[in-house]
A protein has these predicted regions:
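Acidic donor-binding segment of Leloir-type glycosyltransferases
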Residues: 1-23
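Catalytic-site signature of metal-activated, phosphate-bearing donor transferases
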Residues: 25-29, 33, 52-200
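Conserved catalytic core of Hanks-type protein kinase domains
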Residues: 38
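Short aromatic/hydrophobic "clamp" motif used to bind/position activated sugar donors
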Residues: 44
Length: 200
């Protein structure tokens, strides 16, 4: 699919997953760092396969990078998150589902990823810290849970081993209903043709 885009800006890096690494998602961090080590330019923008950014926000994302490029007190840019759950009309609003996270980081600082979700900055060789970051006020649209229970349980059976645990049984009815809210915004155009299928 990626190769079919045929954009000279896109470079696919072939890599091998370490199936022996099954400790707290560290293999995701390994793959993330392979990509980061191959990035050029001033910033690295980390986007997972189930995350989308709205076309209306792209100019503001670029502007944020321009504003903070030469600010030594800013090492990363943080995005808010919409976590869609079960369908594209429902989102989860709870501290248990990370509400914001750094997704853009400067390429000029020493950083590493202990898993796929976040970065740590190394001021010394023995201790890491969260990057100094600015909020963009922009949201990331996370569609990873917009699947049927059957699809989610299949996914769990395949990926949970990388976290050192047994596959979780996904049952949407067990979610605390008080944290499920109706999504009131507009979806990115890139998911326009996909949404009817996931809302069935």
């Amino acid at each position: 699919m990626i190769h079919s885009i045929k954009d000279k800006k896109i470079r696919v890096i072939e890599s091998k997953w370490n199936d022996g690494m099954q400790d707290r998602g560290y293999v995701y961090g390994q793959q993330k760092m392979i990509s980061q080590f191959n990035c050029t330019g001033d910033w690295a923008f980390y986007i997972e396969g189930d995350e989308v950014y709205h076309e209306n926000d792209l100019d503001q994302i670029k502007k944020s990078m321009e504003i903070y490029l030469n600010d030594s007190n800013v090492e990363a840019l943080v995005f808010d998150f919409y976590h869609f759950y079960g369908n594209a009309n429902s989102i989860l609003d709870s501290p248990g589902w990370y509400r914001s996270e750094a997704r853009i980081i400067k390429n000029s600082i020493r950083s590493y990823a202990p898993d796929g979700l976040f970065w740590l900055v190394l001021d010394s060789n023995k201790k890491g810290r969260y990057p100094r970051a600015k909020k963009t006020g922009i949201s990331c649209y996370h569609y990873g849970w917009v699947r049927t229970e059957e699809q989610m349980n299949l996914k769990s059976s395949k990926v949970q081993k990388y976290w050192g645990g047994k596959p979780m049984t996904i049952d949407y009815s067990q979610m605390d209903q008080s944290i499920i809210k109706e999504f009131q915004g507009s979806h990115p155009l890139v998911v326009k043709d996909w949404r009817p299928k996931i809302n069935e």
